[in-house]
């Protein structure tokens, strides 16, 4: 029965968004997710640095990642690690001497964005430096892709290895570099899934599993499912000429009525997947 709900929610979410932005524009966004792949360590490290800043208002304090290129040796994680090691204060002071970022730089404030970023940048470089090439990194990633229970273990590893990169940001990093088995369990996705009672709590792992399951029953990539829910929740299409505003309240109310109707239908003789004894095979892809 839950699979039927997940199927209905995704299909209606896509139609809901198509009405707001147009099918062509939506497909353009989704096609980028399906096809974009990083293929070198420089772009990989750039995306890692960007992912670290993708929370609250941190990016406004750090500024453009591109403006930091000279401090990270053209975004070479190996050279960055060789030069700084894990000495985040050295990096912090070098940036402060060489650039005036948009946000304050206070080396004595443990939780300040620049302290968090400096620590995350160097622990991220240290992690990537374990791989001699992008091909070696890719092979490591693929070790986690053979089963749906293994897929979320990878962001758990990144969460432990890279300072300031929690589970959602690790998922964000992986999806943005082209690993489409990953969706980010952010506040907008959580609001929608919780609002529709498709998850029992806002736990990152539980939300991630539900995104993965929703993708499987719809024969879609988890990253695409994530993007559609995010666009509805945030209203941020990425095109300044298109403003739709946050639509999650409207969508949730519409879907509640449809899910109630589905419950009535299933309760009058139609069986869900679980009642029929059917299982959707777990294994592979966001």
Model segments located where?
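Generic hydrophobic/packing signal
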Residues: 96-99, 125-132
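Structure-specific DNA junction-binding interface
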Residues: 1-113
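Short alpha-helix boundary/capping elements
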Residues: 53-61, 77, 129, 181, ...
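C-terminal accessory module of base-excision DNA glycosylases/AP lyases that mediates lesion recognition
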Residues: 1-42, 116-125, 133-286
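Aromatic-anchored, charged helix-turn/loop surface patch used as a conserved interaction hotspot
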Residues: 104-105, 122-128
């Amino acid at each position: 029965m839950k699979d039927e709900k997940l199927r209905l929610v995704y299909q209606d979410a896509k139609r809901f968004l198509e009405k707001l932005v147009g099918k062509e524009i939506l497909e353009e966004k989704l096609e980028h997710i399906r096809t974009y792949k990083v293929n070198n360590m420089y772009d990989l490290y750039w995306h890692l640095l960007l992912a670290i800043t993708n929370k609250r208002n941190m990016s406004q304090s750090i500024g453009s990642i591109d403006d930091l290129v000279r401090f990270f040796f053209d975004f070479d994680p190996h050279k960055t690690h060789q030069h700084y090691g894990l000495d985040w204060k050295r990096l912090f002071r070098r940036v402060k001497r060489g650039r005036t970022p948009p946000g304050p730089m206070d080396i004595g404030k443990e939780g300040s964005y620049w302290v968090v970023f400096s620590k995350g940048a160097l622990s991220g470089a240290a992690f990537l430096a374990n791989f001699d090439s992008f091909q070696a990194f890719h092979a490591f990633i693929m070790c986690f892709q053979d089963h749906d229970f293994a897929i979320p273990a990878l962001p758990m590893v990144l969460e432990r290895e890279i300072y300031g990169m929690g589970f959602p940001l690790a998922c964000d990093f992986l999806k943005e570099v082209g690993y489409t088995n990953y969706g980010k369990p952010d506040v907008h996705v959580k609001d929608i899934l919780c609002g529709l009672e498709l998850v029992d709590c806002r736990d990152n792992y539980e939300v991630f599993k539900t995104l993965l399951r929703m993708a499987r029953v719809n024969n879609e990539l988890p990253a695409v499912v994530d993007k559609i829910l995010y666009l509805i929740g945030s209203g941020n299409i990425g095109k300044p000429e298109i403003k739709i505003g946050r639509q999650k309240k409207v969508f949730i109310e519409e879907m509640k009525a449809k899910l109630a109707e589905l419950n009535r239908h299933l309760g009058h003789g139609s069986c869900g997947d679980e009642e029929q004894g059917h299982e959707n095979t777990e294994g592979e892809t966001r």
